């Protein structure tokens, strides 16, 4: 039996993690976000009602679940308050269910200004960030000049630290990026107005998780983005600024690494990517348009159209290696309904003619790669809303089996629609 279960994306994000976390937290006592920020977009559909969460863990809708934002998350006070208000307006007592690590770095207005200014300066080489200040906040953390939630306990010292760091960043904005300076007093006033709310939710997360482990409580760790966007293992520099992989759980929450019991990799039945960066199986034809339309592939956070393509088993195998995946949850299988044939990338043909079955790391090394496809029959029957494996078309079952063969990982959960009820749990991670 696994008490500590990690749910993370195996591709470039947008795999459908939010729904699965919400579903599995029926048995959990805690749900923990351990990396990223409000650049995430987790969509939940419960009894037909849609909820999009960016910063607050997906367990917040569960009455008996405590949601935790761990130290690996960069926290925007403004974004958190906006999200809290939206939920509280619907009668959800967020402040009774949400806890924060005092070590969370804060995202403030100058981080957003820097993010936007840098993307503009990059021009055609823009990374495609969400413009929410995520990267600059992580930079401040690593440079040891960042302000954290815990700094708000001493408001006078916080004000002094803020003044110093803003002088540094405003100098960059004005003199290098030719942008407007950010107003110090406004930033200070905005943060001070909600400081007590934030500090009132602070807890020692590492100790809490250790006590939960000793009691045998079920804990779910909710990843954001996807493995191939990891700052170290992704398609650098077209990556996010945090560790999206299973290793980020320990560093981003304070859980001891030996205590992770099961790692569930969310894998979409095809591939998508938002923003710039390598994408070997990207489709520019009518099939790509079909996947985009049928899958409603528009970002929950930015509204940007996602790039679409066939499933890339080579890239997913890299995710299997890095995360030591225990099992897959296959999502959006229903989007492939009606296609006469489906393809899986099983290798890459390099520019020099070599055939390889592993992914490069640096983005430059992906240039000129051609995907090697395996083609399988599609299916005309609908898989939407099917709740038993026996109800799936044989061609769909063959597709699932081939994914398992190519990756060496079992498909333990199959999602056939956006609602939490439209799911087959073949093996529950908490029972594995």
Curated annotation (Swiss-Prot):
Its cofactor is Mg(2+). Substrate binds at residues 300-306. One of its GO terms (molecular function) is magnesium ion binding. Binds 1 Mg(2+) ion per subunit. It is found in: Cytoplasm. Gene3D superfamilies: Adenylosuccinate Synthetase, subunit A, domain 1, Adenylosuccinate Synthetase, subunit A, domain 2, Adenylosuccinate Synthetase, subunit A, domain 3. GO terms for biological process: 'de novo' AMP biosynthetic process; IMP metabolic process. It comes from the Bacteria. GO terms for cellular component: cytoplasm. GTP binds at residues 13-19, 41-43, 306, 332-334, 415-417. Keywords: Cytoplasm, GTP-binding, Ligase, Magnesium, Metal-binding, Nucleotide-binding, Purine biosynthesis. Its EC number is 6.3.4.4. IMP binds at residues 14-17, 39-42, 130, 144, 225, 240, 304. The active site is at residues 14, 42. It catalyses: IMP + L-aspartate + GTP = N(6)-(1,2-dicarboxyethyl)-AMP + GDP + phosphate + 2 H(+). The keyword Magnesium applies. Pathway: Purine metabolism; AMP biosynthesis via de novo pathway; AMP from IMP: step 1/2. It is an enzyme of class 6 (ligase). Mg(2+) binds at residues 14, 41. Plays an important role in the de novo pathway of purine nucleotide biosynthesis. Catalyzes the first committed step in the biosynthesis of AMP from IMP. Belongs to the adenylosuccinate synthetase family. Homodimer. This is Adenylosuccinate synthetase. It comes from Klebsiella pneumoniae (strain 342).
């Amino acid at each position: 039996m696994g008490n500590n279960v990690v749910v993370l994306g195996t591709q470039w994000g947008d795999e459908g993690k939010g729904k699965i976390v919400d579903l599995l937290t029926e048995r959990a006592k805690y749900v923990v976000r351990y990396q990223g920020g409000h650049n995430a977009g987790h969509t939940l559909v419960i009894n037909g009602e849609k909820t999009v969460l960016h910063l607050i863990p997906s367990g917040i809708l569960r009455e008996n679940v405590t949601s935790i934002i761990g130290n690996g998350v960069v926290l925007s006070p403004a974004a958190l308050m906006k999200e809290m208000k939206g939920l509280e307006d619907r009668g959800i007592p967020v402040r009774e269910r949400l806890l924060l690590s005092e070590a969370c770095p804060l995202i403030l207005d100058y981080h957003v200004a820097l993010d936007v200014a840098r993307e503009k300066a990059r021009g055609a080489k823009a990374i495609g960030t969400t413009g929410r200040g995520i990267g600059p906040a992580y930079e401040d953390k690593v440079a040891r000049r960042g302000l954290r939630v815990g700094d708000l306990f001493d408001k006078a010292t916080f004000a002094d630290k803020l003044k110093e760091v803003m002088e540094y960043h405003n100098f960059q904005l004005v003199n290098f990026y030719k942008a407007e300076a950010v107003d110090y007093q406004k930033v200070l006033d905005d943060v001070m107005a909600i400081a007590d709310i934030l500090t009132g939710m602070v807890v020692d997360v590492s100790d809490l998780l250790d006590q939960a482990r000793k009691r045998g409580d079920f804990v779910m760790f909710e990843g954001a983005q996807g493995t191939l966007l990891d700052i170290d293992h992704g398609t650098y520099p077209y990556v996010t600024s945090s560790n999206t992989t299973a290793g980020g759980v320990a560093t981003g929450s304070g859980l001891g690494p030996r205590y992770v019991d099961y790692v569930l990799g969310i894998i979409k039945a095809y591939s998508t990517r938002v923003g710039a960066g390598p994408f070997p199986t990207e489709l520019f034809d009518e099939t790509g348009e079909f996947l985009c339309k049928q899958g409603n592939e528009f970002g929950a956070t930015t509204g940007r159209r996602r790039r679409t393509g066939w499933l890339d088993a080579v890239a997913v195998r890299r995710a299997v290696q890095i995360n030591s995946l225990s099992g897959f949850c296959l999502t959006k299988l229903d989007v492939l309904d009606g296609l006469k044939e489906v393809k899986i990338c099983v290798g890459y043909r390099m520019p020099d003619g070599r055939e390889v079955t592993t992914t490069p790391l640096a983005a430059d090394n992906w240039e000129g790669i051609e995907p090697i496809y395996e083609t399988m029959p599609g299916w005309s029957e609908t898989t939407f809303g099917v709740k038993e494996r026996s109800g799936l078309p044989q061609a769909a079952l063959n597709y699932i089996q081939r994914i398992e063969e190519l990756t060496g990982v079992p498909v333990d959960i199959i999602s056939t629609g956006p609602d939490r009820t439209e799911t087959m749990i073949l093996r529950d991670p908490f029972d594995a």
